[in-house]
Regions:
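Membrane-embedded helix-loop-helix hairpins and adjacent transmembrane boundary segments
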Residues: 1-485
Length: 485
């Protein structure tokens, strides 16, 4: 049995489980079930599901792959993620529950007006569509190499089939189903990583007791970087950026907040947020350990491109190498598709919700049957759009996947973060019709700053802190729009 058919069989079995769970949990779902899970989701299941939703295929492939060049510097940002999650839990979640929002961008309409509301919704649409497509693109490339290319199928067929499968299990139940399917994905993801770590360690003749010291002794396991403020890996850059990254991409993201707000009340939602964030630190640590083991095992036999190691290809190359049993390759595929399909499925649901509620405002017509028809048509439209974006990115991509995702988030989530910061910190009203102008100009200013930072600021490199700068520029722009009493 060839590798391609083994992978296909693995995917088919995995999707069979997803379809069964989705059908059981979502067969009676109405619009409230799709959008909010009827506010009845158990907080501990949401916490487990949140892990699967926040860890995408990019994390699964690129975090271990980035260890060679960046060591464990990513953990500095992950620690910031935890602090950011505390802020989301204590500040944003109670506010969203008090306002009883279906879409969190309804806050912008209440605070500023319709122009700001639509601006936030459109920025989320662009952010999530491009971000989710980039994440899923990474997985499609791996599946194309292992399955579709050996079978003579073009990349476009790969993308259409995989997105269609995601649409099939998510279109009926929405959040009500995703909470349970994503919990399965989280379980598969963790089991996959643990199995790979254990087997690779065994191949290196490392027992469980020897593994910590071997990892600590390797040069790739350095976590903290305090020596050079100009370095993109500098601790305070990554830690502070991680705080604001989570506030923007979790607390102000309809995707992850949609499942968080499906809990019964804000207390349970807070528990979910804090617990899932704590567990995520441990799981990211597993990915980093896996990265060190992969490079220890590969030695000098790293996949290369233009004379440089290709980090994103290391995990797949090792998992499917001749010296490893098929079981490890299968676990790699299970973990990969669990991470990827979880993120893509929840993104489609969130995009459908925001576009239907925020942009089309179909929920305000008072016709539930019409709302259902609109929601289902939008869901199809979001799927088609994602297919198109992935294919375009396939022909344009020339950057490391994880940096592309976070750079994208810094540009598109910055204005959303800025609007919420201004709205919460200042009670003054602004000229709502000019808010879209500020939110478009701000990322353009930040792009110019980032491209010229080393030349203008004595070698200083703007990296992940770009999100903070973008938000601050947006806040300054909104201050200029304050109405005079």
């Amino acid at each position: 049995m060839t590798t391609a058919w083994i992978v296909l069989a693995t995917i088919a079995f995995y999707f069979l489980l997803l379809f069964i769970i989705s059908w059981i949990t979502g067969r009676k779902a109405d619009n409230a079930g799709f959008f909010t899970g009827n506010r009845k989701s158990p907080w501990y299941m949401v916490a487990i599901a949140m892990i699967g939703a926040s860890i995408s295929g990019v994390t699964f492939i690129s975090v271990p792959g980035a260890v060679y060049a960046g060591s464990y510097s990513y953990m500095q940002m992950v620690l910031g993620f935890f602090v950011g999650s505390l802020i989301v839990a204590l500040v944003l979640i109670p506010m969203f529950y008090k306002m009883n929002l279906v879409s969190i961008y309804g806050y912008l309409e209440n605070r500023f007006g319709a122009g700001s509301y639509k601006t936030g919704a459109w920025f989320f649409f662009v952010s999530k569509m491009l971000g989710a497509s980039v994440r899923f693109f990474v997985v499609c490339v791996v599946l194309h190499t292992l399955v579709f290319e050996p079978l003579g199928m073009p990349f476009e067929v790969n993308v259409v089939l995989t997105v269609a499968l995601i649409w099939l299990y998510s279109f009926q139940g929405g959040v009500k189903s995703l909470i349970w399917t994503d919990s399965l994905k989280t379980f598969c993801l963790v089991i996959s990583v643990v199995c790979c770590i254990v087997y690779i360690a065994k191949s290196l003749n490392l027992g469980i007791g020897e593994l910590p010291s071997a990892i600590a002794a390797d040069h790739t396991s350095r976590i903290f970087f305090f020596d050079d403020p100009n370095d993109g890996k500098y601790f305070w850059k990554q830690f502070i950026a991680g705080i604001f990254m989570v506030i923007a991409t979790t607390g102000l993201d309809q995707d992850l907040m949609q499942r968080t707000l499906s809990c019964k009340n804000y207390r349970e939602s807070q528990k979910n947020m804090i617990v899932s964030s704590g567990i995520q630190i441990f799981i990211i640590g597993l990915f980093l350990v896996l990265g060190t083991l992969l490079y220890m095992y590969s030695g000098d036999n790293l996949p290369m491109k233009d004379g440089k190691p290709v980090g994103d290809a290391v995990f797949g190359n090792v998992a499917w190498s001749d010296g490893f049993p098929i079981f490890i390759g299968v676990m790699f595929i299970i973990g990969l598709i669990a991470a990827a399909y979880s993120a893509a499925g929840s993104a489609l649901t969130a995009l459908t919700t925001s576009f239907t509620v925020d942009i089309l405002q179909a929920d305000k017509h008072g016709d539930d049957a019409r709302l259902t028809r609109t929601r289902k048509m939008v869901h199809v439209g979001m799927s088609v759009c994602m297919v198109a974006v992935i294919i375009v990115f396939y022909y344009l991509n020339n950057d490391s996947a994880i940096n592309a995702v976070y750079s994208l988030a810094a540009y598109t989530y910055g204005p959303i973060l800025g609007m919420f910061i201004f709205g919460l910190a200042c009670r003054r009203k602004v000229r709502d019709r000019l808010v879209p102008v500020v939110c478009v100009v701000s990322p353009l200013i930040c792009f110019v700053l980032q491209q010229n930072s080393e030349q203008w600021f004595g070698g200083y490199q703007i990296s992940f802190e770009l999100l903070i700068i973008n938000a601050l520029v947006t806040v300054l722009g909104l201050c200029m729009l304050i109405k005079k009493d």
